[in-house]
Amino acid sequence: AVLDPLLTVEQLHERCDAGRQERVRAICTSLRQLPLLRERLGGQGGPKLIAAIGFPFGALPAELRLAEATWAAAHGADELDVVPDFSALVEGDSSGFAEDLAAITGLGLPVRVVLDMARLPEDLLAIAVEASIDAGAAGVQSGNGFGPPCQAEQVAALSGLCRGRCAIKAAGGIHHPELAMDLLEAGAALLGTSSAPELLQALRRPIA
C-alpha cells in the first residue's frame, strides 16, 4: 500500500519501483496519488493498481462513493478497495449497504470490501460479509489499517464467514514475516501492508 499523503513524488516513485522490483501483486493508493502511480507503473505487466474508495472510514453518501469509484476506474485503477457505508449497517439497513456496493461492482472492476473487524460486533460482521458477497464483491478485507495489527484469529473467523465464496485480504500492522505467514496460514489470500518489499526480501533470506 502507498497511502501516506505526506510522501513526495520522489518517494512515491521509489515505492512503485520497489514494488515492481519485488514483484508485488498490486499497489493500493489514494485517488490523489492514483494518476501519478498509473503513469509510473505504465500499462500491461507489473503490479496492478488498486484505488482506495471511501477511505478510511466510509463516511460518504452513496453517490459520492460511487463517484469516487467511477473516477478511479476512468483514471487507471485495476481494482477497488471500498470502505462501505457502516452507518447503514449499524442502522439495520443491510439492503442499502448492499445496494451501495452493488452499484460499484457494476462498474466492472474487482471490488474488495474493507471491513472493520476490530470494531464490528460478530452479528454485524456476518451481515456485512453476506451483503458484500451478495453485492458481487470479489473479496473482503479485515480492516483499514488503523488500530491494532490484524491477527490470525480474525482471519480465521473471516474465513469461516466467507466459506470460500470470496478472497480474504488481511491488513493492518503487517510488518514482520512471522505475522505475515500466520495470516496466510489462517486463510488470507492477500496481505495489505506498507512494508511489502521489505517483507518479501526478509522471506527470501536463507535461515541461519
What are these regions, as identified by a protein language model?
Residues 64, 69-73, 79-139, 143:
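Conserved anion-binding
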Residues 16, 20-36, 55, 80-98, ...:
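Glycine-rich, proline-tolerant flexible connector loops at the mouths of alpha/beta enzymes
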Residues 60-74, 120-131, 156-164, 168-170, ...:
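Catalytic cores of alpha/beta
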Residues 23-25, 45-49, 76-78, 107-111, ...:
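Short, well-ordered coil/turn segments that N-cap beta-strands
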Residues 1-75, 122, 127, 131-135:
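Conserved N-terminal beta1-alpha1 strand-loop-helix module at the mouth
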Residues 31, 35-57, 92-119, 149-176:
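Alpha-helix-loop-beta-strand connector modules within alpha/beta enzyme cores
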Residues 12, 16, 34-35, 69-70, ...:
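Generic structural signal for well-ordered alpha-helices
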Residues 1-2, 51-55, 74-89, 134-151, ...:
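Glycine-rich phosphate-binding active-site loops on the catalytic face of alpha/beta enzymes
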